[in-house]
Every structure is written in structure tokens, then in C-alpha cells.
């Protein structure tokens, strides 16, 4: 488990195992406000300390009851900077018998960046992690943190944004950001936004634009649109902000100032887009402890393999399925080959649902899977592919709302992938090892490609039948090429 003592909130996350993508079993936060008033007094809030100790009591009790082997306790800006921070740490260690790691600003920035790296393979840009007491900025490239900077721009330090202090707060924010000498390296790259306050802004944007997929991780907003939206938030009254269903009422008071910070980061850094990340410090703490070989594994593939092992009928052999359908998709780009591999992994995970609802259930579940390493369009691609695998149709009721997130070309590809999986799993009955003896190949002649042939000889010739014939006909029509069986 990881227990994160932040300036505004305390959160315990308990993970199952410690591999490349451990699954969260428990995730709860308490808004304690340890850093409330720190800028004026230099001390942790007395009320915040009382609330923190009460909630820590709960979290350590839960961790013990779950049999958690180790709880790593991390403390960030408020505890690091407060004059009585050492007293608080001593009180926690004495009462709960746990060592508290008070992270330096650089270490906090590094771990937050590693959390993003763990969730975004090949991430290239700048991580901005806004906590209650500070904003960490980290330049990441080639899965490494290159430069980092800590700035005192947490909302608890800045206070509330009003019409009267808008110019003063903007000057304070700009003064800190101008001290980040490499900030212009963000230009034209991605800004990865980490932290609960900024995730609240993402939720608000989703609600106001009627976005069809309520998944914060990898939600992206173009820089110009983000600046317009954030400016609107900074000028909206508290009453109207409280009317937003997607934003916690305890986050509303600080929403304008957190919007102003993000707006100035975008205006000064000039990224191409803002990408929101649900992975940060806690996940970076786990990722940092993995061997390098484990770190380099694909988080999407690993997560989906864990899901498949727990929910498939048979021991999953996605590599057999992937090899078998590969001739249909030889010309597909590498990024989509990776999604086809993932679709093969998930192709049987909804078998336990009622047959009338398998497609619907699989579609919704894939859209909402707690996995990373894919953007929202990728989620929709996988959801459609698995829907078609179960139903044979991409026009099922209830699936149209997310359609706009996927291009027509990719939707057509998802349809063909789903039909190919449907054929392969029908042919083998789900026991995909049988596909090893039903070879699929392209047919070519002197003129060029003629289509595909499935060679079934000996006892494997018995795999054919009416259902298989219908599946072949559907896929053949979608591909615009002949598929025939050779006995």
C-alpha cells in the first residue's frame, strides 16, 4: 500500500501485488487541509492535523485488516515546509509505528513523473503535478525525467481567486513560472496534468461539453480550447460552479485559482494539448521499485492479460489467436497492431454473461476498464472490436454516443477485427490451440492477391459447419475479399 500525506488530502491506495500494473483493491482519500493557512502561519493547520490523525488511524486499521505486507508513507509539500512538520512526522511514527518519508521537492517531482511514464508509454512532454502546497514541473522524454522544478503554486498557498486580487495572483504565478528556465521546452509537446484539483477541471469540462466517456485518464483538451475554458472558470461565480454535478463541493472554492494556474502554465509553456493523468506520485513510487526489464513491459497488455486470466473460459492463448488472424491485417500500422493484440487478449472475457447481454456488457466494460496505455479513441476501438466479436454487428443500440471519438477508418477496422475474432473463436469453440491446425494464408496468383484460404486437413476438417460458413461470409464481405476453406 501507499499512503500519501498531501497538503490538502490524505489518500491510501492498496494494490494487489507489485508487478508492472498492480490492480488497486482499495482507494480512498480524505480532505484534511494540513496545509491550510501555511503561507500565513508557517505551521500545519491544527484542525488539519487532528483530521489527519483521525484518518490515518482509519487507514492503518484498514491496511492491517487487509493483511497489507507493507505500507509506504509519503509526505509532501506541507509537511516538508511547515515549521512543525517534524513534530507531525514524529507523532505519526510514534502512534502508528510506520516510517514517514518526507519527500524533497525534486523527489516528489521525480516520482510524479515516473507515475506518468508508467501509464503513458513513449510519453514526451512536461508533467505538471498540482498539489495543495506546490506545483511540480518535470520534463520527460524517452521514459526518463530530464529536468524538474518545484514551485510554491499550490492553491492552499495562493488562497482564493477574487476579482480584486486577480492581477496580483497572476503576477505571483508568472513570477514563479518564469523561474523555470526550461519552461519553453513544453512548446508543441504535451502537458500531462496530475493532481485532484486539475482532474476536477477535467470533470467540469466533460460536463460542460457533454463528453460521452467519463474516464479522466488520458482525457485531452487542445491548448487553445483549454485556455478559453479555464478563463471562463476563473470568471465564474461560486454559485454557478457549485451547480456543476461533476465537481466535488469541497473542490469548488479552489477551482478558480487552480484554473488560473493551469491557464498560465499553458499560456507561458505553449503545449499542443493538455492530457490528464490519473497516475502520479503513488504509482510512480511503485514503478520506481521495479527492475528495469519489468518497467519496460507494456502496461496495457499486462493489465489485460491479468483480466483475461481471471475471466476467460480457458487458459488464454492470445498469441495463437493473434497469429491466426494476422494475414487479414498485414498492412495495419504498428499502433493498431498493438490494439489488435489487446483485442485478442480480451476476446473471451465476457463469456460468463448471459448470451443476450454479452455484447452490451463487453462493450461497456471495455470502455471503462481500469487500464492505462491507451487513449480514449483506442478504448472505443477496442470496445467496438469486442462488441462485434460477440454480436457480429457494430450498430447495436446504446453504442452510438461514443462513436464520434473514433474516425470512420478506425471504426471500419474495429469492425473487421471483431469479425475476424468472431470467426476464429467460432471455428475453435474458444479452444484457440485448435487454430494451429487450421492454417490461414493469403492466396496469390500471377495477377496478385485472390483472397484467403483456411486449410483444414485430417481430423481438423470437422471444424467446419453452417455457423462457420456464416462467419466466413460476413468477414469476406467486410474485407471485400474471398475466403474459402480447403479440406
Per-segment meaning from a language model:
Residues 14-17, 33, 37-68, 76-90, ...:
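Helical "lid/coupling" subdomains associated with nucleotide-phosphate turnover
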Residues 124-138:
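A generic, well-ordered mixed alpha/beta core segment in the N-terminal half of proteins
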Residues 21-36:
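N-terminal glycine-rich anion-binding loops that anchor highly charged ligand groups
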Residues 1-4, 125-129, 191:
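Short glycine-aspartate micro-motif
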Residues 1-23:
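N-terminal basic/disordered segments at the start of proteins
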Residues 7, 132, 196:
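Short, glycine/acidic-enriched loop or turn micro-motifs at the edges of active sites
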Residues 479-487:
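A short amphipathic beta-strand at an alpha->beta junction
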Residues 73:
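Dinucleotide-binding Rossmann-like beta1-alpha1 core, especially the glycine-rich loop
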Amino acid at each position: 500500500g501507499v499512503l500519501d500525506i498531501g497538503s490538502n488530502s490524505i489518500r491510501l491506495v492498496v494494490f494487489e501485488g507489485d508487478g508492472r500494473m498492480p490492480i488497486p483493491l482499495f482507494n480512498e482519500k480524505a480532505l484534511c487541509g494540513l496545509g491550510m493557512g501555511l503561507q500565513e502561519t508557517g505551521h500545519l493547520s491544527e484542525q488539519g492535523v487532528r483530521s489527519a490523525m483521525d484518518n490515518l488511524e482509519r487507514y492503518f486499521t484498514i491496511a492491517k485488516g487487509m493483511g497489507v505486507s507493507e505500507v509506504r508513507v509519503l509526505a509532501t509539500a506541507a509537511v516538508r515546509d511547515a515549521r512543525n512538520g517534524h513534530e507531525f512526522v514524529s507523532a505519526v511514527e510514534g502512534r502508528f509505528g510506520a516510517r514517514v518519508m518526507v519527500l524533497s521537492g525534486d523527489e516528489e517531482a521525480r516520482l510524479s513523473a515516473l507515475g506518468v511514464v508508467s501509464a503513458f508509454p513513449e510519453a514526451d512532454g512536461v508533467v505538471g503535478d498540482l498539489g495543495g502546497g506546490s506545483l511540480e514541473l518535470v520534463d520527460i522524454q524517452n521514459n526518463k525525467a530530464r529536468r524538474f522544478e518545484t514551485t510554491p503554486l499550490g492553491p492552499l498557498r495562493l488562497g482564493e481567486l477574487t476579482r480584486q486580487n486577480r492581477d496580483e495572483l497572476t503576477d505571483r504565478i508568472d513570477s514563479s513560472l518564469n523561474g523555470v528556465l526550461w519552461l519553453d521546452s513544453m512548446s508543441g509537446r504535451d502537458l500531462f496534468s496530475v493532481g485532484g484539483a486539475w482532474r476536477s477541471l477535467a470533470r467540469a469540462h466533460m460536463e460542460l461539453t457533454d463528453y460521452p466517456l467519463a474516464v479522466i485518464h488520458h482525457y485531452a483538451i487542445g491548448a487553445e480550447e483549454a485556455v478559453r475554458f479555464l478563463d471562463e472558470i476563473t470568471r465564474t461565480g461560486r454559485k454557478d460552479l457549485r451547480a456543476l454535478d461533476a465537481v466535488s463541493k469541497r473542490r469548488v472554492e479552489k477551482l478558480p485559482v487552480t484554473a488560473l494556474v493551469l491557464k498560465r502554465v499553458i499560456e507561458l509553456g505553449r503545449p499542443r494539448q493538455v492530457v490528464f493523468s490519473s497516475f502520479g506520485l503513488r504509482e510512480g513510487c511503485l514503478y520506481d521499485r521495479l527492475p528495469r526489464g519489468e518497467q519496460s513491459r507494456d502496461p496495457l497488455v499486462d493489465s489485460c492479460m491479468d483480466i483475461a486470466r481471471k475471466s476467460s473460459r480457458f487458459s488464454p492463448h492470445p498469441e495463437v489467436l493473434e497469429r491466426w488472424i494476422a494475414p487479414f491485417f498485414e498492412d495495419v500500422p504498428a499502433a493498431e497492431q498493438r490494439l489488435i493484440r489487446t483485442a485478442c487478449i480480451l476476446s473471451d472475457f465476457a463469456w460468463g454473461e448471459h448470451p443476450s447481454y454479452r455484447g452490451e456488457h463487453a462493450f461497456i466494460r471495455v470502455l471503462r476498464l481500469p487500464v492505462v496505455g491507451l487513449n480514449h479513441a483506442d478504448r472505443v476501438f477496442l470496445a467496438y472490436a469486442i462488441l462485434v466479436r460477440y454480436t457480429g454487428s457494430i450498430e447495436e443500440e446504446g453504442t452510438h454516443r461514443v462513436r464520434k471519438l473514433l474516425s470512420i477508418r478506425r471504426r471500419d477496422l474495429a469492425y473487421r477485427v471483431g469479425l475476424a475474432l468472431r470467426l476464429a473463436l467460432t471455428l475453435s469453440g474458444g479452444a484457440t490451440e485448435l487454430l494451429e491446425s487450421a492454417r490461414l494464408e493469403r492466396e496469390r496468383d500471377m495477377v496478385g492477391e485472390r483472397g484467403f484460404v483456411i486449410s483444414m486437413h485430417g481430423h481438423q476438417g470437422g471444424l467446419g459447419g453452417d455457423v462457420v460458413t456464416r462467419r466466413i461470409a460476413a468477414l469476406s464481405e467486410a474485407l471485400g475479399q474471398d475466403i474459402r476453406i480447403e479440406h
